[in-house]
């Protein structure tokens, strides 16, 4: 889950803090502030969700650290990745956090772009999908350009129909 840390962000290991340039650079500018409006893309992609502090996924040092981890998993045999809460990581068209130069996490994480000379291993051989719950502020088409998506609206509609006994 690259987008958030545990509720107790002070328990983050020093190695991660050091890798990203310090604890203050690990989070978005409002990454320790609760999201109050999930229809606001800036809050949704940079704010604290459900008590979980929001990681500055646009920080190149974090991207490098994360990509090293993912490449280690690939070297161990992983051939696919599911991104939980993917809609909480910004897209290139989203508002830019004050601590970021650009929203390029998905370009790096899916192998379209290198970070600090490091690229995703075997990007064309991986299956990548993300939890992007459909809602008013979600840019499903843009996320779908990077990964397959969980069809949350379809699942909800199907469960509702089955529970109601309505099969039309």
Regions found by a protein language model. Give the residues of each.
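Active-site-proximal helices and loops of the catalytic beta/alpha 8
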Residues: 3, 68-168
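Generic detector of intrinsically disordered, low-complexity, polar/charged segments
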Residues: 12, 18-19, 28, 44, ...
């Amino acid at each position: 889950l690259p987008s958030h840390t545990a509720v107790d962000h002070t328990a983050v290991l020093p190695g991660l803090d050091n890798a990203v340039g310090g604890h203050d650079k690990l989070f978005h500018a409002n990454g320790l502030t609760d999201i109050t409006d999930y229809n606001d893309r800036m809050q949704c992609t940079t704010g604290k969700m459900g008590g979980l502090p929001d990681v500055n996924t646009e920080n190149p040092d974090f991207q490098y650290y994360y990509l090293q981890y993912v490449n280690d998993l690939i070297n161990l045999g992983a051939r696919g990745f599911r991104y939980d809460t993917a809609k909480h990581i910004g897209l290139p068209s989203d508002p830019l956090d004050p601590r970021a130069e650009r929203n390029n996490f998905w370009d790096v994480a899916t192998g379209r772009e290198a970070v600090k000379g490091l690229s995703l291993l075997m990007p064309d051989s991986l299956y990548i999908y993300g939890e992007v719950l459909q809602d008013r502020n979600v840019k499903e088409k843009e996320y779908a350009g990077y990964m397959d998506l969980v069809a949350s609206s379809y699942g909800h509609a199907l469960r509702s129909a089955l529970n109601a006994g309505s099969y039309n």
